[in-house]
């Protein structure tokens, strides 16, 4: 019941609006399968077997694997890889997703949480997710220099998955500083 209450299908909520980046005009997005594709990425997971898995919701239109898209938030072209529908921790490969569907894709290299994806010929920027600034920071270091690369790789993956997590290297103290919620 909570999912239905807090995450209703786009088909049962009022149309949403976005901004056309070139003209800054407001555009209304109807939740219709016949309109051009528009979706938003809401989660990124690093999978040890398939790599990055980007979860997204389709607000209008439909999308198939191999479709050329525009990441409007970043201004970069992307190619939709295989599309899967997640059922618990199992993946069900599907041909296409339509307005109202939630799915995931492998192969979106430059897409992160909150990014808007559209067809290249109809760019539209939906309201992005606003994340709070980190509230705590701590210095970390590996047990040995040999583990530095593993630590760095792990921190990069964690930062991709969690937009509230940040990492930086402090030149003065020669320490890695991680910040988060």
What are these regions (language model features)?
Residues 1-181:
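Structural and coupling elements of P-loop NTPases
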């Amino acid at each position: 019941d909570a999912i239905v209450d807090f995450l209703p299908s786009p088909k049962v909520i009022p149309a949403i609006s976005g901004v056309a980046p070139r003209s800054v005009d407001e555009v209304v997005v109807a939740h219709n399968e016949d309109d051009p594709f528009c979706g938003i990425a809401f989660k990124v997971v690093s999978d040890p077997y398939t790599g990055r898995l980007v979860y997204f919701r389709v607000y209008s239109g439909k999308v198939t694997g191999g479709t050329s898209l525009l990441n409007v938030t970043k201004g970069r072209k992307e190619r939709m890889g295989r599309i899967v529908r997640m059922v618990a921790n199992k993946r069900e490969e599907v041909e296409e997703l339509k307005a109202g569907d939630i799915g995931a894709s492998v192969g979106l290299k430059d897409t992160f949480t909150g990014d808007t994806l559209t067809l290249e010929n109809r760019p539209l920027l939906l309201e992005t997710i606003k994340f709070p600034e980190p509230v705590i920071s701590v210095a970390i270091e590996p047990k040995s220099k040999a583990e530095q690369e593993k630590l760095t790789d792990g921190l990069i993956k964690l930062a991709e998955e969690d937009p509230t997590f940040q990492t930086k290297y402090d030149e003065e103290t020669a320490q890695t500083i991680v910040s988060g919620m």
